[in-house]
Amino acid sequence: GSIPCAESCVYIPCITGIAGCSCKNKVCYYN
């Protein structure tokens, strides 16, 4: 929830989700 994963999730889910990232405010964040 605090560290950006350098990925947006406006149109597609977070590919970095496999690394623990999740979508928040159209941006992928880690924890």
Curated annotation (Swiss-Prot):
This is a cyclic peptide. The keyword Disulfide bond applies. There is a cross-link at G1-N31 (Cyclopeptide (Gly-Asn)). It comes from the Eukaryota. PROSITE patterns: CYCLOTIDE, CYCLOTIDE_BRACELET. Disulfide bonds join C5-C21, C9-C23, C14-C28. This is Cyclotide vico-B.
